[in-house]
């Protein structure tokens, strides 16, 4: 008896390409494993024998193989229409079984993974008849009727771990193999396949030019369904402060999509992830941060020589606040995904300090073609006409992005928000918390045809440039952010940094008044107290995975000025302990303490009661998880989420909030959320809803 094998079933209707997929997948897996392959077509007892064949397959093939025994079974003689010879299928490290019914209900308890292959009916019929010729044609309808009868009571696609739209273009085996190592039941056996990605090399090109970032992104990724632009849109202002904290945060911009050989996308909702690679989609039931720990954190590539950035390709996107269910908070749902990420096997990185563009691509058959196209796009975006063309498409420097200003509604009226402030102060007085970061949500619906999310973002980045601005497109979901706040950075060498913002004043057009507002913020005892409480919280969060004694506060209650606000910012640094999980270190700090209050866990429970609804992406995080183990994440504030509902409308949501302490004045706190919303609302021509 051999050890119990990993058994992968490939199921689907006749003509879906199961046999070819199984053969190709087995060939690829044999690079690292012993693989046995079984075809159900060898065991069906005739053209009306689907159900009997499934029973025979489970009893005589799956049962013994699942125990690690050889399977002895009776084949079917299709020419003479009766039982044929006795055959043996030997156990192996991996067994692939394919055919209609391979993943039937009776079989699933013995399977490690289920792949469902599908194709349009006309493609399936043509493929099956081309393969089997005239022998099959008289029986097509009879066999198809059996399939439909079986599937009416056994919804195999619903139980599939991987679904593949087999287009017969040769892409299915590679796409499926990208996803199989993510399945928990297969991960141990397929560790060589996952490790193989860590041996990939990065090809780089440095171009000494300053392309217009918006023109370049639009040229390369304007038609991509899934694309990310981490946009240091205040780079020109920050560059005037060489060597400053602001200049360091604003040095690099990153843009990428999920196309190409290595491209993937991932969406997570309530403990379940959906991963896509080309024509294949996998469903993985696993907490997000546990999944992240399997795909990121162990350095998979080395930083290319001469390349100054920390991002060396990997995952980019956003994490929603409701992931707090995995870090000590309660379980709530949100209308938008809890996480949306792409895996970029190629990207453009702009170094604003040096005035260069870097092209990065994992080695792949399509790398040369992409590098050539990206090089041409960078050169075109460096021409004098590029910025003017983008500005014209956006309707001017501060152009209106909607024909009519949207009317926003608030989850809380002014009266309700002030009552919630009082309730938060009651919790503080009772000793249940020290600080409560109370938030609300503004929302509006507009005709989808009247709003171009790309133009909306261009207007936002001009109106309110920020070091952690970003534009994320995930199908019908768009994120347009002008965040000034870093949540957490972990460098490839393990250096950790958090830079919480607590304390906000509006900017004024009059220089004297503006300077006075900045001075008032710097001197505010209330704002300093709020900031210092969050600094203490983040010192604690970082300490869980930091080298003892390495946690330091290098900047306390400094004032930074942006286009529409002054902010109070602190900096906490630490060194990650060698061997610690980077994903767990991120989870230990999530969500950002500046968006919860302190102590974090009990305050999140208070917020759940007070706020009465999910926050979604707001107060989550936006950034990257790089193949060299680095991450840089911003807090998702000053962030407009645009969700195309599919009914011809688009819902706009904007979260705003502020820290409530015992000294808070309700009217001042309400004015603060108006100030924070102003940059986004004014760009849309909208007003704060004061009802």
Give, region by region, the residue ranges found by the protein language model.
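Conserved nucleotide-sensing/catalytic segment adjacent to the nucleotide-binding pocket
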Residues: 36, 43-90, 94-95
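ATP-dependent NMP and nucleoside kinases share a basic, alpha-helical "lid"
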Residues: 85-132
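Extended alpha-helical targeting/anchoring segments
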Residues: 183-691
